[in-house]
Amino acid sequence: MWSYISFRSLLAFMLALLISAWFGQHFIKYMRRKNFTETQRDAKIDPFGVQKIGVPSMGGIIIIASILVPCLLFGRLRNIYMLLTTVWFGLLGFLDDYIKIFKHNKDGLHPKAKIAGQMVLGLIVGLTLYLSPDAVIRENITKTRTVDKSEVIIHKSEPVKSTITTIPFFKNNNLSYTEIMSFCGPYKNAAGWLLFVIVTVLVITAVSNGANLNDGMDGMAAGNSAIIGLVLGLLAYVSSHIQFANYLNIMYIPGSQELVIFASAFVGAMIGFLWYNAYPAQIFMGDTGSLTIGGIIGVLAIIIHKELLLPLLCGVFLVESLSVILQVEYFKLGKRRGVKQRLFKRTPIHDNFRVLPSQLDPDCRYVFGNWPRSATHESKITVRFWIATILLAALTIITLKIR
């Protein structure tokens, strides 16, 4: 039974969920007893009067423990970079939360230091995948039968190191970073790997920050991440199974089945954490959790060569990030012209849906000041964002067959 990946994955899922639920209860009591709770909250971002002050934070510790224990028990430590990612981002987020809670500095870790930490981990992962002899694929190719001229999908017999990744809506589902850099002539292979490492750094940094921005309402980030983790686990499974890889016309990645166990533990930890993080939250994951889950999603997608599916799969994270970027740039543009202006009532975009008219700045021009016309309770906003992520997850899976 131990050789069956499905058996070990289910065990990892259940144990992660149970650890998260059991440990969470005791962790919340400990944090309350020590008074390690939210102490700095702007009432303006809480239009429904939900009392956030006094709720323990740093719940990401629960998530990290719930992921690591099942992976160490039921997984093989071949994919050590997933464990490294979890610990690295956990420490980065913990440092940020520590400064906020214990040093009473609401800004936390300096943004440049946070970005630097994310980029360093991205660089480590990118270089590891470049240097490791185990990071190989068997490329999917299309051949035409001589008898009936029909096309069939086969995989090359020898595993190779490759910069090929899965891309949606293209006929053969593949994109090679090396081919993109073909203009470099004899140096295209080195240039292709350099581009791959750069993309790795950007993806990990972007997804980690996107998850961090999405963590603004009770249960929001945990629910969205559980859905995304489920899809990535499914993609890891079909990538590790040569028959499924043939059917879906995607590359076969030997050894990626162990990532299914990690993804299962990740989903279990998220669902278990929701037991306490669902509205009204008894604990917040803090940056210890949000940075970690974003980093895990980014690294997992890169290892299974599905990072170009993330703009669709993590569409909610993408929209949250873009809303903040556009809001800041539009505000700066107006400031240079001496005009106080904003695109949205508030960002990240999920906050835009719960702002009351009385909370708007009367001296500011809002491009979308009438959208939406009325405020929505945060629990309903959260569920609607989950539904959006479910739809995006379904579309992501569908793209594997749309060419």
Feature roles, as predicted:
Residues 146-186:
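Extracytosolic (periplasmic/ER-lumenal) interhelical loops and adjacent juxtamembrane/interface segments
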Residues 41-55, 106-117:
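Juxtamembrane helix-capping/reentrant segments at transmembrane boundaries
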Residues 1-30, 35, 63-91, 120-146, ...:
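Alpha-helical transmembrane segments
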Residues 170-202, 208, 382-385:
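Individual transmembrane alpha-helix segments
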Residues 30-47, 99-102, 106-107:
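Flexible loop linkers connecting adjacent transmembrane helices
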Residues 42-51, 81, 104, 180-189, ...:
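Short juxtamembrane and helix-loop transition motifs at transmembrane-helix boundaries
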